[in-house]
Regions:
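Extracytoplasmic "Venus flytrap"
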Residues: 7, 14-31, 55-61, 84, ...
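Segments of small-molecule ligand-sensing domains
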Residues: 275-285, 296-355
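An alpha-beta-alpha
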Residues: 17, 118-179, 202
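Extracellular/periplasmic periplasmic-binding protein-like sensory domains
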Residues: 216-289, 350
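Hydrophobic alpha-helical segments within soluble ligand-binding/sensing domains
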Residues: 64, 121-144, 157-159, 185-189, ...
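Single conserved hydrophobic/aromatic residue that forms the stacking wall/gate
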Residues: 1-13, 363, 370-373
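Periplasmic-binding protein-like
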Residues: 71-83, 103-105, 146-149, 199-209, ...
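Beta-alpha junction/loop-to-helix N-cap segments that form part of ligand/metal-binding clefts
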Residues: 23-30, 42-112, 121, 180-186, ...
């Protein structure tokens, strides 16, 4: 690698492109690529081209730390990553010790950005759990609700806990809550039967799309047809190879982005993404794309240059991120507080005729806490 070339802001991105959550990592990779190409073609950041490199963490905490160290040896000055919560929680310990700026597009656990060098683009687990309960209650989708969640996953268990707390406040009756673990995530007959016997009108699934696809198929065979509601981990279910999309008809989930939105920015992004990668972007691609442009805005506000140390860049970006207001694909007028959490409005989508359709949702600001509700 020619280090004599002006490398601008050495933006470095890490995501998993193999493993259980490969569809998310690939989406993040492509979203970043599109943004970097656009910015570099327009002159870069503060007149400097972005040079970036990515490592595949395979959604594994140990491999994620190894990938971080590889990137640090390469000369990383800032990090967009990781894609999922458990690896991100491990990596943020390292980036904090190094005072290296980190912006995750999609790690939702509170602990993923527990230090002042870390920010996120997505909603946190508490926000998703409480917002989902609010939407279900405020729109009278059901009174009796069951939950199927992954107790071995920080993303799933974090959303579940806050959903149950908010559901009680909103007058929803959680008639069944059954967990599974990473070691037992193929047969959901017990969880489905429990929800069915309890008379659940709606089943909340704060899980990833792989397990959700199995639950929908097995529930169909069991003659159980409640309403289904999930969170951003559900995004991608329609792209799952071998999955019968008709089983997801009327499935609803919380997300900051839908490719069917009619605003000009989204439609341009979708068209450009399809041209570049031959696929329709999911939320994770939009989150990643927004990460690059948010860093650009903060870097330009603080006049960051590539000759600065990673630590000095981090200090500048910590200030810049809390001062910008960013209009992106995943939200308009997005702002960040010092704890790294974004404020933006969520969207609910429903699957209809094999496509995601946006549903208006303006009830909750993303940075509201449970005490605010």
């Amino acid at each position: 690698r020619d280090r004599s070339v002006s490398r601008g802001l050495g933006d470095v991105y890490k995501r998993q492109t193999t493993g259980d959550n490969a569809i998310y990592g690939t989406a993040v990779k492509n979203g970043i690529q599109l943004a970097v190409d656009e910015i570099n073609a327009a002159g870069g950041i503060n007149g400097k081209q972005i040079e970036y490199k990515f490592e595949d963490d395979q959604s594994d905490a140990e491999k994620s730390v190894n990938a971080y160290n590889t990137l640090k040896d390469w000369g990383m000055q800032m990090l967009i990553g990781t894609t999922t919560s458990t690896p991100c929680t491990a990596v943020v310990e390292e980036s904090h010790n190094d005072n290296l700026f980190q912006l995750t597009p999609s790690a939702t656990a509170v602990e993923s950005i527990q230090y002042d060098n870390a920010f996120r683009m997505c909603f946190s687990d508490p926000n998703q759990g409480s917002a989902s309960a609010d939407y279900i209650a405020d729109n009278n989708l059901a009174k009796k609700v069951a939950v199927i969640y992954n107790s071995s996953d920080t993303y799933s268990s974090g959303i579940y806990q806050n959903f149950v707390t908010e559901a009680e406040k909103k007058g929803l009756e959680v008639v069944a809550a059954k967990a599974f673990t990473a070691d037992n995530k193929t047969d959901f007959s017990v969880q489905i039967q429990k929800a069915k016997d309890a008379g659940a009108e709606l089943v909340f699934l704060p899980i990833y799309y792989q397990e959700a696809s199995l639950i929908l198929a097995q529930a169909n065979k069991a003659g159980f047809s409640p309403k289904w509601f999930g969170c951003d981990g559900m995004d991608g279910i329609l792209d799952l190879e071998g999955f019968d999309a008709s089983l997801a008809e009327n499935l609803m989930f919380l997300t900051p982005f839908t490719a069917n939105a009619t605003d000009d920015a989204t439609q341009k992004f979708v068209a450009d993404f399809k041209d570049a990668f031959g696929d329709t972007p999911i939320q994770f691609a939009a989150d990643a794309y927004d990460c690059v442009y948010a860093i650009k805005a903060a870097a330009e506000k603080e006049n960051i240059t590539p000759d600065m140390s990673a630590s000095d860049i981090c200090d500048a970006l910590k200030k810049g991120m809390t001062e910008i207001t960013y209009d992106g694909l995943t939200g308009k007028s997005i702002t960040w507080s010092e704890d790294g959490e974004p404020t933006k409005d969520p969207t609910v989508v429903v699957v209809q005729n094999g496509e995601y359709q946006a549903v208006s949702y303006t009830h909750l600001r993303a940075h509201e806490t449970l005490s605010d509700l």
